[in-house]
Amino acid sequence: MKPMSRLALFALVAIALVRPAAGQVPEDRSHRWYWGATAGGFAYKTNDQGYFVDPMIGVHWLITGKRTALYIGGEQAFLLTEARATVVDQNTGSAHDVTFDQVRRLFIGLMAFPLQQHIEPFAGVGVGLMTVQNPTADCSGATPTAICSTPADAANAEALAQSAGSKAVGWAIGGVQINVGKLAVFGQYMINSAANNFLLSGATHTFSGGVRYSFGSSKEDVTSEH
């Protein structure tokens, strides 16, 4: 096949996906169960290092109403380079280094789909629980804050690491979705609020794309025969 023919075929396929046929009525996506998956990047920083962006995957459950939806899901970030943060004992003022390499976030919130079109924007807000997986106090002596002089110091450093490893956060999301029958393809950006005494400093950000598929109605049809 000639290059121009390939280009023309690709353009026709793209148009078919992005724009519904003339006169086609957009499918009603109200009151449906959607299961979906995402992949993208997780941007974070600590009080010991600037922003890093590492890979993230997630799954979610979307239950639609007319123009709103309940959004429930979870995401896991895998840090390619071990992250380092410093925790401070509020009672003694002593500081200890902590390392970790994974972050998990569970969330719930409300989404709005105002246009109900083939291509539509969406936005939402909610709350979540962000957890640094298996934070470990560093007692290697490599830095002045990685010293545990006694077993009691080591135990205290580990307790501080665990205490600073999980916090509640708020979040906001925005994106664009392309609907093709029961399938939806989307791209989105999410920002998570900062939390006090947390191993992650400031807001965190996720940039992701994904798909979700409707597996049926979330509302029983009362007119159907039983």
Model-based region annotation:
Residues 31-33, 51-57, 100-106, 119, ...:
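Residues that define the transmembrane beta-barrel architecture of outer-membrane proteins
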Residues 55-142, 214-215:
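Gram-negative (and chloroplast) outer-membrane scaffold detector with strong preference
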